[in-house]
Amino acid sequence: MRKLTFAMNVTLDGYIAAPGGDLGWSGGEGPDSSPSAELFQWWSDRVDATGLALYGRKLWEAMSSHWPTADKQPGATPAEIEFARRWRDMPKVVFSSTIGKVDWNTRLVTGDAVAEIARLKAGDGGPMDGGPMDIGGATLAGAAMRAGLIDEYALVTVPVLVGGGTPFFTALDSWVNLTLVETRTFPGGVVLTRYETRR
């Protein structure tokens, strides 16, 4: 059975995007909200270790609009070049009934997302991941949460309050008990907390 993790940047008040989908808060360190080099490397290493990433439409559109060619942009840093390569190479599944085509080592699923995630989880191989920097996967992850398919939650909490937007945790049908397995701090007051689902 493959492990499924939901990992995202989140505000201190629990949102993955501010109203209107605004992500200007999500980096956490500099005045431009860019992530620290240490945090960016953590996300890059996570992408490199992911056996399969699962994306909803919004996440796919955000990631595929930047990372496929980010390493060719003027001024791209070595870390951005490495992340772009890792992201292109990482196997991905996009769940959408409105997207017509996907590229970059990606497969499109238009049917029942929960059934397909359960099927993928039942296989063997590397860990499955909800998607690094998953800015639009709240709906997909929420469905997987309600179906009891998520094994681990990794919250990268940025010390900012946005007052509303897209919540990290959607409405659940029942309680989910978790066990803390890791905490780590990054520059700018960003805190990683990882929890495993108690089964």
What function would you assign to each model-found segment?
Residues 1-199:
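Enzymes that bind and transform nitrogen-containing heteroaromatic metabolites
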